[in-house]
């Protein structure tokens, strides 16, 4: 690999993402380990089916087919068509999940690629893979794919936002903790049991607000998001009314 590590580190890392972050089954983990074999070696679908299983061979072949698809246009309509095509090609949803895991690890190690390759892969990730992750409900992966893409598409903007957030981390943590406690207390006063989560919005989300609305970070007021989880639909509506 470009970073000097053995090639096997990549399939191992992809398999780890599939196992630990997506919690997929053993067939998916094995397929993730083998996902580059048809593309990069002389191994065939038939050999993989015989050595492992037909299902694993199908998964690996499916990932290989997705790998050979590249965008040719920056037009939104064409991008949408490509997203639909990738989803349609993935007859088994695990194929696209493995491919997204593959892309995520490649983006995590993108610093070793040329600037041209960094921008090309980042644009492709931002326009194709992050939206697909969103459609599949994989929000944490979507956010990370977007942030990693922004890092190479606009290094200056990315650095300004992350450095500003780091500088104010203690202040923001204190604010979020206070808001969390206030929400929990208010709900208890109403007799509603709930689980409350708070998080800082991720850099790309903040970047979009800053650069599409021409605002500074200090002018972006919705930097935080809170999630309130209750047991019943009735409680949900009660919370909305508080």
Description of each model-found segment:
Residues 1-223, 230-242:
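Active-site helical microenvironments for divalent-metal-assisted chemistry
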